[in-house]
Regions:
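Long, intrinsically disordered, low-complexity segments
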Residues: 25, 43, 99, 112-115, ...
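Hydrophobic, small-residue-rich alpha-helical packing segments that form membrane-like cores
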Residues: 167-279
Length: 579
């Protein structure tokens, strides 16, 4: 108590001294600050500031959402030095997920709303000072900002479902702390997001001179994604899935993917090229978060991709921390029989290819572009062949590494200490993703042959993606196109489209959201936990933490609102059900 009194008295004495002398400093203008009125008077710069938030993230709040979309699923393990490395472990087991654990959820919430605040300020700036721009440019910039705001809100809705809708009017009226998160149903919130994307679609050009800006085609693709999300239900398994299809929304998916299919975007010729930095902003890339190397933009470290800063392979990169690890179940999913997936029996036996030792078991070529495996070149470079030493904790997270989010090792990092960071763009929407959305909708409205045609186009590209980058695995690859008989019923077609989506988009942070949309998350994940905890690689077991894993429907479909957000304004927000 004496110590506390001394601290208080000392603080009061210091305050007296400060107040006695503060008159000398009150008239001094602060340095290195931004005059808000001046900033708001420059609408074009305010729009640029909103764009800047796209890549303004960190591993504790990665806007590409790899912890939320992948390590929560059957595609990936968390990785790292063990289950306590970062606070993401509850995501991979679900059973220990609470409103305060992991605390990274609060960072994600906060930074997504910071991004939305940027957008709202830009919209106010355009409304009040837009006459500094010509009429056409002003409308385009407004379309871009509303696209960005919808993009950030879509992420919030994906994670939490019930979130407060704070737009420029709420910002103007300073009513943020009076805006409830349960004011809108799932559908009402999604339709507000749709309204923003629709404004962008109606007012943006089909192409922009500056790479990285949103355009009409990106808005069409996002509209398709929104309508596809709504078409299956509200996300909770009791009211989601094949028995809850909204045909009108599925037709909207067809309508907007028609626009994408008729645009100048398309499939890159080789699957591997999609994930090489020299092909960023290619015809495959409809919208991507832009990143750069310091050698390109003349800055100290470049505009690095900090979302993936932990996801480099252990021992391969100077600071690769070995997070975001492909699962054995995912590797098994690439098995083929007669060139087609082994739907019923793919996971009966734990298997993996070994370089130079082909067996009767063949694999979809996309495996070798997606998963780094011991004995194989790391991202196509023989001088950087992976070994078992390239896994940080194989007794916990196995021996595989993710390849898509990293460049080739010879290209180096743009930042290398104490973490590595790369100049890889982050795809938000790529052409193949959108075409698979189209195939999904075609199945549900009864155009099974149209869906088969899309899937076979994608598989043909995969078949053609061996010689250029993975010739060393040619004797282990086998892939075939689907005959019409494989798409004979809606159930058969649905299975094949969903499987194709898993193979094509593996490790691209969408898997859990796909499972939830289809209404099959609990059955898929609880079966995965039961099998995966017994996985053995080269005689060694791992993934024992899945003994404690369980996905609870009517609860885990969405994440809990962060406790800190509930605490800030008690009674304003309603927690998601089950938490």
């Amino acid at each position: 108590m004496k110590t506390l009194n001394k601290i208080v008295l000392g603080t009061l004495s210091l305050c007296t001294l400060l107040f006695a002398s503060c008159d000398n400093y009150l008239t001094v203008e602060p340095k290195a600050t931004i005059d808000e009125d001046l900033a708001m008077s420059e609408p074009d710069k305010m729009v640029t500031a909103a764009y800047a938030r796209l890549g303004d993230d960190w591993y504790t709040y990665p806007f590409n959402m790899w912890p939320y979309g992948d390590i929560t699923s059957d595609d990936a393990y968390k990785g790292g030095s063990g289950t306590t490395d970062t606070n993401y472990h509850p995501f991979e087991v679900w059973s220990s997920l609470t409103s305060s654990s992991p605390d990274h959820m609060d960072e994600m919430w906060y930074h997504l709303y910071c991004a939305i605040s940027r957008c709202n300020r830009a919209l106010v700036s355009l409304a009040e000072h837009g006459d500094k721009l010509d009429a056409e440019t002003r409308k385009i910039r407004e379309g871009e900002v509303r696209f960005l705001r919808a993009h950030f809100y879509f992420k919030l809705a994906q994670i939490w479902n019930q979130v407060p809708w704070i737009d420029e009017e709420v910002y103007r009226n300073h009513t943020e702390e009076k805006t409830r998160n349960d004011a809108n149903t799932h559908e009402e919130l999604m339709l507000k997001i749709v309204d923003d994307f629709k404004f962008a679609y109606d007012n943006l050009p089909a192409s922009q001179a500056e790479g990285g800006r949103a355009n009409k085609i990106a808005a069409a693709a996002y509209l398709a994604k929104c309508y596809l999300t709504m078409a299956w239900g509200d996300g909770y398994e009791a009211t989601t899935g094949a028995d809850h299809i909204n045909p009108a929304y599925m037709q909207k998916v067809i309508e907007y993917t028609d626009v994408v299919a008729g645009s100048g975007y398309g499939y890159l010729e080789d699957f591997g090229d999609i994930f090489l930095p020299e092909y960023k902003n290619s015809k495959e890339s409809i919208f991507a978060v832009q990143h750069s190397d310091y050698k390109d933009d003349n800055t100290k470290y470049g505009r690095a991709n900090w979302s993936n800063m932990l996801n480099g392979c252990w021992g391969m990169w100077s600071c690769g921390w070995d997070f975001h690890k492909p699962s054995q179940n995912l590797v098994n999913a690439f098995k083929t029989e007669g060139g087609l997936p082994m739907f019923e029996h793919y996971n009966d036996k734990i298997d993996y290819p070994v370089n130079g030792a082909p067996t009767a078991q063949k694999w979809d070529p996309r495996l070798f572009h997606t998963v780094g495996m011991p004995t194989f070149p790391y991202k196509y470079e023989a001088e950087y062949t992976m070994t078992k030493d390239n896994s940080r904790t194989p007794n916990t997270y196995g021996y595989y590494a993710s390849l898509k989010e990293v460049p080739q090792r010879s290209k180096g990092e743009t930042f290398d200490n104490p973490w590595q960071a790369f100049a890889m763009n982050d795809y938000v929407l790529r052409y193949t993703d959108v075409m698979l959305m189209r195939a999904e909708a075609m199945v549900e409205i009864g155009n099974l042959e149209g869906a088969r045609s899309i899937v076979n186009d994608i598989r043909q590209r995969a078949k053609n993606s061996v010689a250029k980058h993975i010739s060393y695995a040619a004797d282990q690859c086998e892939i075939a196109l689907y005959p019409a008989s494989d798409f004979g019923t809606k159930e058969d077609a649905r299975l094949r489209v969903q499987w194709e989506r898993r193979l094509e988009l593996a490790m691209e942070n969408e898997r859990f959201f796909d499972l939830r949309r289809w209404g099959i998350a609990s059955q898929t994940l609880n079966k995965f936990f039961e099998v995966e905890k017994n996985s053995v690689y080269d005689g060694q077991t791992y993934a024992q933490y899945y003994n404690d894993a369980h996905f609870t429907p009517a609860k885990n479909e969405y994440f809990p609102l962060p406790y800190i957000q509930l605490f800030y304004v008690p009674g304003l927000y309603t927690q998601n059900k089950g938490y």
